[in-house]
């Protein structure tokens, strides 16, 4: 869309209204780049995003996003091979933290159906390794000691050397007190010195670093600390070199992910912008309009967003309506009405909410043109008429059926008769070309054109003759009328003079009386419509209140049910645990047959109440996830007090964590969680026993290929129980060859199981060492 219309309608000022609601520099940049589009799919997407964000705010009214700075330049430097400094790493660290918080928020989100927003939430990346690396930089811009073992070693040596210097100087302060001007340790040129009286300067061996202005004090670094100070200076150089190496190393680790991080930053900004739109809706009672497929416009109680205390008006630009001609005197708000229509269309086509009531519809226009104001006449020293005509000629050459045209004071600035004729001719040309046009004029001749011409409608701005002030109410379908006689009377002009004047234009008076009647009818209709709207608003408020109450009651009910289910589940679990222990004791002390033990266990399970399926229990899910650490969680290593990030879990249950550049192996008791991430729910896989029939009787097969070790062992245990219950004499276990870990686990399990008579690898033609055949005791 042409830039001139955006300047004329002051679209940048409108966009500035959304800035206070933004939290990120990425969102601010996207807002500033925002422009209207004629692509219906993009507009629909923007509208859908706003509606989903509104629904999200109903459930999460305090939803927020971590503030972030622009990182496009940082990522570009990385891609070009540059190494980052600490400040740049802190910007990236902030973006990764914002991304992780949004992912966690989305994972915990309930009772909201998302589609467009889900797409953005799910495109965010997870970088647990990088998060651990970036923990090396604290928010004060300091590289932590744990960033590398070498850095920690150097800083320990610096600390020890500085302690030695302090100790030596403190001893000298006591020993040489009478030779010093003050009993303090001073600092000169980065060295620790003693303030020695000039008369004793030769009594204390060392390096002179400064002399006081009076010459009475000489600042000497004692010989005893010179060597230590030189060591410290050397260590400081080593520290700087190691810090530079750390910056280079972490830059290399981040570099492959620069594009992904930049994309995450854009998504964060996009979500921030959508959030800002909804905050604007809440603040200004704006709405997401409907999108018309045929350029039909219906604006209910629409306001100009930049006008304080703006009067709300209705505008209906039907599919067949080509032109709306607003007639009547100046200063009544005609120009504001033009700008309101144009600006509302620009806002909607830019994916922004509009200041109107629900039920409002907007069209889609490829271009919006306007001739408003006298900018050209000032710039080019042209007359008002020449300025308008120059602009209109240019516009007429560009408009088509997909354009919206706004013309202010059409035909003004020349002879009234010629100006009116030109205005009608221009409107007729636009009508025949089916170009939607809203025009303002003060020529009375255009009233007749609006009445007599098909697909053209008159309109006016209401004027209160009692107060002699415009009300700024838009009256569609009612042409403007002159109020000169009424105003003259109220201002004290003689009734005789007013009467003489009115007799000279009897015909016009007849027209004015008709217009007056139309105004009265329009006002009456508006009052009725306002009353209907008030009732609708009350009904909407009542409906919202009832829905809110209903949802709250349902939540309370669900909470109580969940508590009861949890208690019941705990009781059942406790009973089953006790039954397992009893059966274990029986098995170790008695000669019960295997199938009798399994049958007894099954009977005990039947005695317990039916176990409630808590897989959908939100409370339990959150409690479990809160207790269990997961990959990507931030941790504090208890022995060091340093932060890191979990990167993987080992087979023995221990965890690998990235703490700066150091990778550590920790047990759960050696760290605390800082903020757990919500992992995606993983459906439990059932162990399926596939029965087959052959000459040897009932058999079964279990396939463990592709399973993790713990998962495979659990499935094997359940499978053997089921096989014994079915009195199977023999089963096949397919574990594959692979690394041999699962095969070895199967072997150890079968060796321990007292119900197994024998087992061995399958024949070569039946799987060989990739499968084990198990025979049970009779």
UniProtKB/Swiss-Prot annotation:
Domain Smr: 702-777
Record carries keyword DNA-binding: yes
SUPFAM superfamilies in the record: DNA repair protein MutS, domain III, P-loop containing nucleoside triphosphate hydrolases, SMR domain-like
Keywords, alphabetical: ATP-binding, DNA-binding, Endonuclease, Hydrolase, Nuclease, Nucleotide-binding, RNA-binding, rRNA-binding
UniProt enzyme class: hydrolase
Residues given in the record as ATP binding sites: 328-335
SS bonds (residue pairs): none
Described purpose of this protein according to its UniProt entry: Endonuclease that is involved in the suppression of homologous recombination and thus may have a key role in the control of bacterial genetic diversity.
Subunit structure: Homodimer. Binds to stalled ribosomes, contacting rRNA.
PANTHER family (alphabetical): OS10G0509000 PROTEIN-RELATED (PTHR48466), SMR DOMAIN-CONTAINING PROTEIN (PTHR48466:SF1)
Protein name: Endonuclease MutS2
